[in-house]
Amino acid sequence: MEDGIRNVDVERFARDVAATLADRRGWTGDGRWRLQRVGRDDPADFTVLLTTPVTRGRLCGDPSDRYTSCRNGDQVVINVARWVYGVPHVTDLSRYRQYLLNHEVGHRLGRGHERCPRAGGPAPVMVQQTLGLHGCTPNPWPLVGGEPLAGPSGQYDDPIPAGDR
């Protein structure tokens, strides 16, 4: 967690990350992936970072975007503003946080953005749910009913909200 972030419990953040990535509905649930937490000084395939919106802009290569999170190389960058406040169209903050982690880790695992496959159905985790649902319902998990949920490849032309809240 970046120095200077206040009112976020670093231990709880770490527990939430570990629980989300170990959940049977997550990327490891169908046995295709194995994820393991390692120590601070041990080699890692990727690192989950909780950053301020300004640092997110720098690490993600787009200083004008202080709203979204990203994956850049082996860094999964979680914007603390999204972690704390979520987004207006997803009312369950815990589920939104699970989505946020699974979506950005999905990029690290090689997955691209997807579109909503069926109005009224759950959104694949690789839909940019931070920006909109496009007829789908919020869904934080790569697996639904034990099966991978995917939509057509691509993304919507949603505007990125201004500001960092």
Model segments located where?
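Acidic/histidine-rich, surface-exposed loop or edge segments in extracytoplasmic proteins
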Residues: M1-N7
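Active-site recognition of the HExxH zinc-binding catalytic motif
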Residues: S94-G112
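Metzincin-family zinc-dependent endopeptidase catalytic domain
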Residues: E11-Y96
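Metalloprotease/metallohydrolase-associated module, dominated by Zn2+-dependent proteases
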Residues: D65-R66, V76, W83-V87, R115-R165
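Structured segments of extracytoplasmic/periplasmic soluble domains
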Residues: A19-T28, R108, G112, Q129-G132
